[in-house]
Amino acid sequence: MRISPGRQTILTLAVLTMLCISFADAFSLDMPTTQKYADTYNKQIENVPSVLKSLIGSEKVNIIVTREDGSNFQVGMDIVSARIERTVEGGISDPTIVITTTQSALGEVIKSTDRIAAFKSQTDAGQIRFEGKSWLANAKIKALLSSTSFLQFCYGLFFS
């Protein structure tokens, strides 16, 4: 079965969105906490149907969070076959997707009783940004983030 690159990118973005929301739970911007949440994600991904895991595919992702004091926390994730194979302090060279946000934006998500709505509000306001390294990836990111029902489905899949 051949899976189109478009489906792989959209599902990968859904996974990354859920990862950002899970990192918001921790709100501790350090490598041990990041690794803990990567490990938790990897355990959850084992419960996802194989067909969905095959659609998620592989990506190199950098997440950059500007802390309240103005410093940056940057972590790279090498996602292979839907699993986070490694986290890299400082980021990965040549990422396929870059997620940029602030500690205060994550705080808004944490405080909310409806984290999906808060996450969507922060992305709509540009406080949480996803950047694909191609125009096609950017178009797919925009389509994914505009679907609240899809975000809720993915959140339930990984965190229920």
What is each of the regions a protein language model found here?
Residues 2-13:
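Bacterial N-terminal signal peptides that target proteins for export
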Residues 12-22:
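Bacterial N-terminal signal peptides
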Residues 24-160:
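Feature captures hydrophobic
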